[in-house]
UniProtKB/Swiss-Prot annotation:
GO terms for molecular function: phosphatidylinositol-3,4-bisphosphate binding; phosphatidylinositol-3-phosphate binding; phosphatidylinositol-4,5-bisphosphate binding; phosphatidylinositol-4-phosphate binding; phosphatidylinositol-5-phosphate binding; protease binding; superoxide-generating NADPH oxidase activator activity. The PX domain is required for podosome localization because of its ability to bind phosphatidylinositol 3-phosphate (PtdIns(3)P) and phosphatidylinositol 3,4-bisphosphate (PtdIns(3,4)P2) and, to a lesser extent, phosphatidylinositol 4-phosphate (PtdIns(4)P), phosphatidylinositol 5-phosphate (PtdIns(5)P), and phosphatidylinositol 3,5-bisphosphate (PtdIns(3,5)P2). Binds to the third intramolecular SH3 domain. Required for interaction with RAB40B. The fifth SH3 domain mediates binding with ADAM12, ADAM15 and ADAM19. It holds the Pfam family PX. This is SH3 and PX domain-containing protein 2A. It comes from Homo sapiens. GO terms for cellular component: anchoring junction; cell projection; cytoplasm; cytosol; podosome.
């Protein structure tokens, strides 16, 4: 490094220079290490060169390898589309360049003292003796170099190259002009400009006091009022004007950057049109592209007089290109150099050039009628005929003489008025860009990329006019709907498919790996009304036993197999009584339970999507995906007691799920469930409703097999496991009607619009074939979201939304119970108990407060009256009889009649007498448990340990009931619910606690603790889980193989124990964005899921459509990763 170095550099001002061309330099005060100061002058280009040298020499410090390591300051960028040598640009750059200099000299010595920096700031001869500029007056006619500042106008021989002045002609602006492009200048009338270049296109490059740019020649006039250098003309026949003679004594040449005007006569020149032109007035000539025309007269205003097809008239010069065969002749005629400016950067070079010969006189600043003459060699000036009214017509002999090459050519200005030429003063010629266009090859048209559409993931459609497909299949898009559904053709099939499952690629690139990275998280809303007929409700076929595989709502295969309204034949075999007995085992789809698939599924990290997060937060009401352990518990129960309702539902779920069968896991789960139940009972009163909501989600994802059975979507031969099934099968009309309504709701849902199955209507009398179940109707029929997996009877959504069927709903409870045992299964709004179910022992309760029904499925009653509880739902909705009326009522409005034993309470009300004893005991304990749960829920609500979920009235999806907003998840409408603790029935010892459950909270009233499935509500206490375990055993023993036969919960909507199921890569919903979420409630994990406290931040790495997200928990000493229920998360602000 140099000891003598720059200590400081300050840019103080800018200064204009005109040598070699107009530009600005920055005045820099440089202080050196020896305390000496110098003033140097540098133009921007020198700064730019220095910067490039530094970046090349110090790539690391320049940030080329790592931008974060850059220490070399940034230099103001180049001006690409504007003149960088105008004052306003120079002034704007002043401060940034000053900062650049200051920063530069403060860099580490190996940079600030390098040779490049030293040479840049070192004083040069021009810095010591800066050129003196004489700017003259604004009226000057030319700008001289410093050596000729006061040189008078005189004849110059041109012998001395260094002594010759360069003249820039001055013109006066005759009219205001507003620039249209950056390269142009705006003009004010009366302003004087220096003409640097005159282009045949009619656009001249001029310089004002501060800037330079292109302007239309028609707006300029020579200072003496003439149109100088526009045309060649003579004043009289065979006679040269006096002005012309005067100029013969001078150089017949005038400097312009465009070149010199060569006043030679030549034949008419042939030009080829480069683009079509349509005449806009009678004195113009139109032509097509590529035709040859003869140019009779040229001028620098951009309009040439041409002959085409025997007609003569004016045409824009920019549309003409010299014919190739005419170029040689033209070259021979050139007496001087013709300079064509191909680049603005050549201007300075031209200014430095010397005139090679002074054989021609400069164009005369002709009479008022003259027009400027072309800079390039001007062709033979064909004069207008007298017939045209030209005052300056030249007789034929003059024309012939000129044609022979007469040395003296008078200039004639085309009297536009006389020859009816365009009024160029008000009409600028075509843009200069157009005129230059023919000189440059036209950019090629962008290559058209042919694209094709293909599917990016597997999708199973359950709507009549939908289409199922695998990932990677080629699809032809026939119609696109703004709702997010496209009508596509895949192979020989056509139908509606979610646009989020379709991507496009270049046709040639067939090998492109299908990816879901950019695929929207969830299928969009249903297609347009186009498939309306399909919307009329998935019927029969879709709802057939095959339907279980196909959810009514369209879900991607990976989202969780939907067991939609399937009722397992085995389950169907189970008598309604069994179902009533609470043994209602969720029909177990033949398909592996979603839980198992979920467990297998492992979504890719980074598959997060905020939208899904938001939806999922509300979708899963409880920790539903809660502990797989609980699920396992239930699963175990199911595996061990597959016959038992709980076990059957679980077994379905678990059976399909890899771990479901593991007794050990189930027991562990039970214990965990128990433990969690207690903890969460205190903690999350809302869990219940949450569980129900989870249930909904599960249903959407493909409810657990039990739920599917409960939906009894399967063929009618299967006996309804749930009341809904029963109803469908023809169980007591009341119950059947309810189920039918629920099913009808399911059926009615337009197929075109996949949505969460509506809550089953509670109309018991109406039984509807499962085929007619429609998602939308089901959804409408869904009971309060808070219900427990309540017997899985309803699909998740159903469960969550339907009032939980309490013990009274034995049949659906059977499945529900299995679900209760499996707590995982959400309870759908209990369909009205079938008569068999509710004919069982009814418990008398007293109303503690008046209640006004909100939906038709509910019942109103005054305070202090006795009502008979026919069916109980864990969600807190009980089916009661008051006088001749029956309907759903919130359990917290009822208190046990002192004289009444809760024997049949809980599920047992519905249970068959055969199971009555066990059920009775269970119901008794359940009753107590329910009361305890209610109390806990109330406490939790007050504590707001988990976000409370507004309950929904049993009969439908009415807003009044507080049903959570319906959201689309994987093409299925789902009830958005916040996590709420769903309590598994605590051990009987806790029964003394009685508290009204919130409407959407699920009671753990079911017989025993049900194993919690992943989408089921689990806020069940672990103790409850243990109890459930015991109950499962009892149930298994008492019910024996009957439990498997128990139909799924009434009106059950498929509920899937939604554990993250393995998903093909192609099915992953990827999103590269990493989002940070915050937990909104405590969650106690299991061996498969991660537990966390409320308020914990976590980064979403993967999002599984079933509602389980793979996250990295950020809070804590050591971050860890695991699956967490998405409904326990909310976006971090």
């Amino acid at each position: 490094m140099l000891a003598y170095c720059v200590q400081d550099a300050t840019v103080v001002d800018v200064e204009k220079r005109r040598n070699p061309s107009k530009h600005y330099v920055y005045i820099i005060n440089v202080t050196w290490s020896d305390s000496t100061s110098q003033t140097i002058y540098r133009r921007y280009s020198k700064f730019f060169d220095l910067q490039m040298q530094l970046l090349d020499k110090f790539p690391i410090e320049g940030g080329q390898k790592d931008p974060k390591q850059r220490i070399i300051p940034f230099l103001p960028g180049k001006i690409l589309f504007r003149r960088s040598h105008i004052r306003d640009v120079a002034v704007k750059r002043l401060k940034p360049i000053d900062e650049y200099c200051r920063a530069l000299v403060r860099l580490p010595p190996h940079i600030s003292q390098c040779d490049e920096v030293f040479r840049f700031f070192e004083a040069r001869p021009e810095d010591v003796n800066p050129p003196k500029e004489d700017y003259g007056s604004s009226k000057r006619k030319s700008v001289w170099l410093s050596s000729w500042a006061e040189s008078p106008k005189k004849d110059v021989t041109g012998a001395d190259a260094t002594a010759e002045p360069m003249i820039l002609e001055q013109y006066v602006v005759v009219s205001n002009y507003k620039k249209q492009e950056n390269s142009e200048l705006s003009l004010q009338a009366g302003e004087v400009v220096d003409v640097i270049e005159k282009n045949e296109s009619g656009w001249w490059f001029v310089s004002t006091s501060e800037e330079q740019g292109w302007v239309p020649a028609t707006y300029l006039e020579a200072q003496n009022g003439t149109r100088d250098d526009s045309d060649i003309n003579t004043s009289k026949t065979g006679e040269v004007s006096k002005r012309r003679k005067a100029h013969l004594r001078r150089l017949d040449r005038r400097w312009t950057l465009g070149g010199m005007v060569n006043r030679q006569h030549s034949r008419e020149e042939k030009y080829v049109t480069v683009q079509p032109y349509t005449s806009q007035s009678k004195d113009e000539i139109g032509f097509e592209k590529g035709v040859t025309v003869e140019v009779i007269r040229k001028n620098l205003e951009g309009w040439w007089y041409i002959r085409y097809l025997g007609k003569e008239g004016w045409a824009p010069a920019s549309y003409l290109k010299k014919a190739k065969d005419d170029l040689p002749t033209r070259k021979k005629n050139l007496a001087g150099p013709v300079e064509i400016i191909g680049n603005i950067m050549e201007i300075s070079n031209l200014l430095n050039k010397k005139a090679s010969g002074d054989k021609e006189t400069p164009p005369a600043e002709g009479e008022g009628h003259e027009a400027p003459i072309a800079k390039k060699e001007i062709s033979l000036p064909i004069l207008c005929n007298a017939s045209n009214g030209s005052a300056v017509g030249v007789p034929d002999r003059t024309v012939s003489r000129l044609a022979q090459g007469s040395p003296a050519v008078a200039r004639i200005a085309p009297q536009r008025a006389q020859i009816s030429s365009p009024n160029l003063r008000t009409r600028p010629p075509p843009r200069r860009e157009s005129s230059l266009g023919f000189q440059l090859p036209k950019p090629p048209e962008p290559p058209s990329v042919e694209v094709e559409y293909y599917t990016i993931a597997e999708f199973q459609s359950c709507i009549s006019d939908g289409i199922s497909f695998r990932g990677g299949q080629k699809a032809e898009v026939i119609d696109k709907n703004s709702g997010g559904w496209w009508y596509v053709q895949i192979g020989e099939k056509e139908g509606w498919a979610p646009a989020s499952y379709i991507d496009k690629r270049k046709k040639p690139n067939l090998s492109r790996r299908t990816s879901t990275l950019t695929r929207p998280k969830v299928p969009p809303p249903a297609p347009p009304s186009k498939p309306k007929e399909a919307e009329e409700g998935p019927t029969g076929a879709s709802e057939s036993q095959d339907s279980p595989r196909k959810l009514k709502y369209e879900e991607p295969e990976y989202d969780i197999p939907a067991f939609g309204f399937d009722s397992e034949p085995e389950l169907s075999e189970e008598p309604v009584e069994d179902r009533a007995s609470g043994e209602r085992r969720p029909a177990q789809p033949h398909r592996p339970s979603p839980a198992s698939s979920l467990q297998r599924a492992r979504f890719k990290v980074g598959e997060s999507s905020e939208d899904v997060a938001l939806e999922e937060e509300t979708i899963y009401e409880n920790e539903g995906f809660r502990p797989y352990a609980e699920d396992t518990l239930s699963a175990r129960g199911s595996s061990g007691d597959s016959d038992s309702p709980g076990s059957s539902s679980l077994s379905l779920t678990r059976k399909n799920s890899p771990k479901s069968g593991s007794p050990k896991s189930s027991s562990l789960l039970k214990l965990k469930a128990e433990k969690n139940a207690q903890a969460e009972m205190g903690k999350n009163h809302s869990s219940a409703s949450f569980s129900s909501s989870i249930t909904i989600n599960t249903t959407c994802c493909s409810s657990s097999s039990s739920s599917s059975s409960s939906l009894s979507k399967t063929s009618g031969d299967l006996k309804p496991r749930s009341a809904s099934d029963a109803g469908i099968r023809g169980t007591p009309k009341v119950r059947a009607k309810k189920d039918a309504d629920a099913n009808a709701g399911l059926t009615s849902c337009p197929r075109a619009k996949p949505s969460v199955r509506p809550k089953p209507f509670l109309n018991r009398a109406e039984s509807q074939s499962q085929e007619k179940m429609d998602i939308s109707t089901l959804r409408r029929q869904l009971r309060p979201t808070g219900q427990l997996r309540g017997g899985l009877k309803g699909s998740k959504s159903e469960d969550s939304e339907l009032p939980p069927q309490t013990a009274s709903e034995a049949p659906s409870e059977g499945s529900r119970r299995s679900s209760s045992d499996l707590i995982t299964l959400p309870a759908t709004t209990p369909p009205c108990p079938t008569k068999k179910e509710w004919e069982g022992p009814a418990t008398s309760y007293m109303t503690c407060s008046a209640y006004q029904k909100v939906q038709d499925s509910e019942i109103s009653f005054p305070a202090g009256v006795e009502v008979q509880v026919l069916e109980k739902q864990e969600s807190g909705w009980w089916y009661v009889r008051f006088g001749e009326l029956e309907g759903w009522a919130p359990s917290h409005y009822l208190v046990l009649d002192e004289n009444e034993q809760p024997d049949p309470s809980g599920k047992e009300l519905d249970t068959v007498p055969a199971k009555g004893r066990q059920n009775e005991g269970k119901s008794d304990s359940l009753e107590k448990i329910e009361r305890r749960v209610q109390a806990l829920n109330t406490v939790n609500q007050s504590k707001k340990a988990t976000p409370p979920i507004p309950s929904k009235p049993p009969g439908g999806f009415g807003k009044t009931s507080g049903t959570p907003a319906v959201k689309m998840r994987n093409g299925v409408r789902q009830v958005a619910v916040r996590p709420q603790s769903v309590f598994v029935s605590p051990p009987p010892k806790d029964n003394n606690l009685s508290c009204a459950l919130r409407r959407n909270e699920s009671l753990t009233a079911t017989d025993g603790l049900r194993g919690v499935r992943r989408n089921s509500s689990f806020s069940t206490a672990r103790s409850a889980a243990a109890e459930a375990k015991g109950r499962l055993a009892e149930r298994a023993a008492s019910q024996g193989s009957d439990s498997p036969l128990l139909p799924a919960q009434r009106n059950s909507i498929p509920v899937s124990p939604v554990r993250p199921k393995p998903i093909e890569k192609s099915q992953f919903i990827h999103n590269n964005l990493k989002d940070v979420y915050v937990s909104i409630a405590d969650y106690e994990g299991d061996e498969e899921t991660a537990g966390f406290q409320e308020g914990v931040s976590m980064e979403v790495l993967e999002r599984n459509p079933n509602g389980w997200w793979y996250c990295q928990i950020l809070d804590g000493v050591k971050p860890f990763k695991g699956w967490v229920p998405s409904n326990y998360l909310e976006k971090k602000n």
